[in-house]
Amino acid sequence: MAGQLRLTSGKDEDHFQHQGAVELLAFNFLLILTILTIWLFKNHRFRFLHETGGAMVYGLIMGLILRYATAPTDIDSGTVYNCGKLLFSPSTLLVNITDQVYEYKYQREINQHNISPHQGNAILEKMTFDPEIFFNVLLPPIIFHAGYSLKKRHFFQNLGSILTYAFLGTAISCVVIGLIMYGFVKAMVHAGQLKSGDFHFTDCLFFGSLMSATDPVTVLAIFHELHVDPDLYTLLFGESVLNDAVAIVLTYSISIYSPKENPNAFDTAAFFQSVGNFLGIFAGSFAMGSAYAVVTALLTKFTKLREFPMLETGLFFLLSWSAFLSAEAAGLTGIVAVLFCGVTQAHYTYNNLSSDSKLRTKQLFEFMNFLAENVIFCYMGLALFTFQNHIFNALFILGAFLAIFVARACNIYPLSFLLNLGRKQKIPWNFQHMMMFSGLRGAIAFALAIRNTESQPKQMMFTTTLLLVFFTVWVFGGGTTPMLTWLQIRVGVDLDESLKEEPSSQQEANKVDKDMTKTESAQLFRMWYGFDHKYLKPILTHSGPPLTTTLPAWCGPVSRLLTSPQAYGEQLKEDDVECIVNQDELAMNYQEQSPTSSSPATKLALDQKSSGLTLGKENIYEGDLGLGGYELKLEQTRGQPQMD
């Protein structure tokens, strides 16, 4: 071996441990500084630089200091030694050095061009996170919180549009970015900046899929603060939530695309196999997440855990996390599973929780989401200097900037035109321009890019992704408020209090669940809400009509077993609305809440009197439900007792 080896002693190991504590402390102070800056921004209503942009700035400063103010601690770390006797890479390796045996663990494969001059810098290596930390620790709380805090009323009103943008729009963005980048790659080969065969079309599609993941967290935070039009907020929020899940599964499907003959040629069988993998993984992850939420709902319904809020909250958290881990263990996508687990938990399990657990779960995941987001954005700034294998290519970066803007335009404007053909409440041009402007890149694109940085194309993608995130967060995030003013989008809208806070009672939760429909998918909603109200809600929660009144007589034992005793009492008090949309009219079945009223006028008066007791309640006769010219009728639900 060339040179004398410096062996690690027990004293050196203690030094490394103390050094690790110092590095974690530095990162901790970085987060503290970020939190204080956020308070300063909120206190002075400073909207030209969002908190996430500030976190990235602090990360950049810290990374700059670590990069150039620290020296390598192990001069032999970058030296390559040949082991001709090994035919494969074992998970652990025992090495005898001067009669002392040392154990080494496998980390990753490193190509010759990946060996950095900073390879021996222990501080930079420690500040470079394992990519799996993002997917297994930091991303799940963010995605679960997005599903758990989903404002269902406006989301389901615009569900058809949201699904179109999330699924079809993401696919369009992926293909457009892939095609444009393939053209720039060919130009790079022609200019001699890239070798022919180093960057294939599948690599371009892979880059397109990860860059299709939008993360307008900065824009949405400003929207929430300014109370922007609820429909615009919901379209953008709903698209970003589902778009993340679609982009992750799409990226995985492209990465396992493997034709039999030429691995980089188009193969019809391999293409349809990838499509099948996409659908199977997405459906399986959806089922896994929903199943864990159903189990949680049943446990919280049929046990007395509500008497012990700490245990109830702990069980809720662990089962929700298990949805992610089980999906990953089964070869599915944990992010998709935990997203739909959060949506289902909010729809069913939340109603079974005690008041303490409702508050605790909401605050717990809100806090975890806040902390995880700021950790990720701080680390983005760090990664620009601590990542040791950046590849900056001006032509590739220029092509990526052009590609994401063109792809966003090909996504928003054509799909909005098609959606407006069938919508009563059109998506106006200023909404479309704002959605085009809000296509920021963030945590998901960064996590997908950093997960695989072994080859030169992947390293170039990661570097470019990092720069795109910086640009979109700083420029587009900071320009959100001026853009709202320029596009004349209304702010300070208070049409739906549920956009600002969760329902404050069981009755309001049921009302929000039922008071939603859209002409674009009325038949589907009529079937779903009827099934949900009559069967799923009574099975999984204490609300809804007793199963003894909705199931056939021969199901008597099962219905009595699954019906909660509280359901009989709640049946008389429940303020539940079921929207049924037909071709010519809308019949709304409405259960009375007051024992002294049966007319709509009386009901409205009582709702106004009780508004002080039930915060966030919405008058169903006000605002635009998006029902067009349908006639609204009120009918007493058959089979339900009417209070006199």
Curated annotation (Swiss-Prot):
<feature type="topological domain" description="Lumenal">
    <location>
        <begin position="186"/>
        <end position="203"/>
    </location>
</feature>
<keyword id="KW-1133">Transmembrane helix</keyword>
<feature type="transmembrane region" description="Helical; Name=11">
    <location>
        <begin position="387"/>
        <end position="407"/>
    </location>
</feature>
<feature type="transmembrane region" description="Helical; Name=7">
    <location>
        <begin position="278"/>
        <end position="298"/>
    </location>
</feature>
<feature type="topological domain" description="Lumenal">
    <location>
        <begin position="67"/>
        <end position="126"/>
    </location>
</feature>
<feature type="topological domain" description="Cytoplasmic">
    <location>
        <begin position="299"/>
        <end position="309"/>
    </location>
</feature>
<dbReference type="InterPro" id="IPR018422">
    <property type="entry name" value="Cation/H_exchanger_CPA1"/>
</dbReference>
<dbReference type="GO" id="GO:0055038">
    <property type="term" value="C:recycling endosome membrane"/>
</dbReference>
<feature type="transmembrane region" description="Helical; Name=1">
    <location>
        <begin position="21"/>
        <end position="41"/>
    </location>
</feature>
<dbReference type="InterPro" id="IPR002090">
    <property type="entry name" value="NHE-6/7/9"/>
</dbReference>
<feature type="topological domain" description="Cytoplasmic">
    <location>
        <begin position="487"/>
        <end position="644"/>
    </location>
</feature>
<feature type="topological domain" description="Lumenal">
    <location>
        <begin position="1"/>
        <end position="20"/>
    </location>
</feature>
<feature type="topological domain" description="Cytoplasmic">
    <location>
        <begin position="148"/>
        <end position="164"/>
    </location>
</feature>
<keyword id="KW-0812">Transmembrane</keyword>
<dbReference type="InterPro" id="IPR006153">
    <property type="entry name" value="Cation/H_exchanger_TM"/>
</dbReference>
<keyword id="KW-0813">Transport</keyword>
<comment type="subunit">
    <text>Homodimer; phosphatidylinositol-4,5-bisphosphate (PIP2) and phosphatidylinositol 3,4,5-trisphosphate (PIP3) could be involved in the dimer stabilization. Interacts (via the C-terminus) with RACK1. Interacts with CHP1.</text>
</comment>
<keyword id="KW-0915">Sodium</keyword>
<feature type="transmembrane region" description="Helical; Name=4">
    <location>
        <begin position="165"/>
        <end position="185"/>
    </location>
</feature>
<dbReference type="GO" id="GO:0035725">
    <property type="term" value="P:sodium ion transmembrane transport"/>
</dbReference>
<feature type="transmembrane region" description="Helical; Name=5">
    <location>
        <begin position="204"/>
        <end position="224"/>
    </location>
</feature>
<keyword id="KW-0967">Endosome</keyword>
<keyword id="KW-0050">Antiport</keyword>
<comment type="function">
    <text>Endosomal Na(+), K(+)/H(+) antiporter. Mediates the electroneutral exchange of endosomal luminal H(+) for a cytosolic Na(+) or K(+). By facilitating proton efflux, SLC9A9 counteracts the acidity generated by vacuolar (V)-ATPase, thereby limiting luminal acidification. Regulates organellar pH and consequently, endosome maturation and endocytic trafficking of plasma membrane receptors and neurotransporters. Promotes the recycling of transferrin receptors back to the cell surface to facilitate additional iron uptake in the brain.</text>
</comment>
<feature type="transmembrane region" description="Helical; Name=6">
    <location>
        <begin position="236"/>
        <end position="256"/>
    </location>
</feature>
<keyword id="KW-0406">Ion transport</keyword>
<dbReference type="InterPro" id="IPR004709">
    <property type="entry name" value="NaH_exchanger"/>
</dbReference>
<feature type="transmembrane region" description="Helical; Name=10">
    <location>
        <begin position="365"/>
        <end position="385"/>
    </location>
</feature>
<feature type="transmembrane region" description="Helical; Name=13">
    <location>
        <begin position="466"/>
        <end position="486"/>
    </location>
</feature>
<keyword id="KW-0472">Membrane</keyword>
<feature type="topological domain" description="Lumenal">
    <location>
        <position position="386"/>
    </location>
</feature>
<feature type="transmembrane region" description="Helical; Name=3">
    <location>
        <begin position="127"/>
        <end position="147"/>
    </location>
</feature>
<dbReference type="GO" id="GO:0032009">
    <property type="term" value="C:early phagosome"/>
</dbReference>
<comment type="similarity">
    <text>Belongs to the monovalent cation:proton antiporter 1 (CPA1) transporter (TC 2.A.36) family.</text>
</comment>
<feature type="transmembrane region" description="Helical; Name=12">
    <location>
        <begin position="430"/>
        <end position="450"/>
    </location>
</feature>
<dbReference type="GO" id="GO:0042742">
    <property type="term" value="P:defense response to bacterium"/>
</dbReference>
<feature type="transmembrane region" description="Helical; Name=9">
    <location>
        <begin position="334"/>
        <end position="350"/>
    </location>
</feature>
<dbReference type="GO" id="GO:0015385">
    <property type="term" value="F:sodium:proton antiporter activity"/>
</dbReference>
<dbReference type="GO" id="GO:0071805">
    <property type="term" value="P:potassium ion transmembrane transport"/>
</dbReference>
<dbReference type="GO" id="GO:0005886">
    <property type="term" value="C:plasma membrane"/>
</dbReference>
<feature type="topological domain" description="Lumenal">
    <location>
        <begin position="451"/>
        <end position="465"/>
    </location>
</feature>
<dbReference type="GO" id="GO:0055037">
    <property type="term" value="C:recycling endosome"/>
</dbReference>
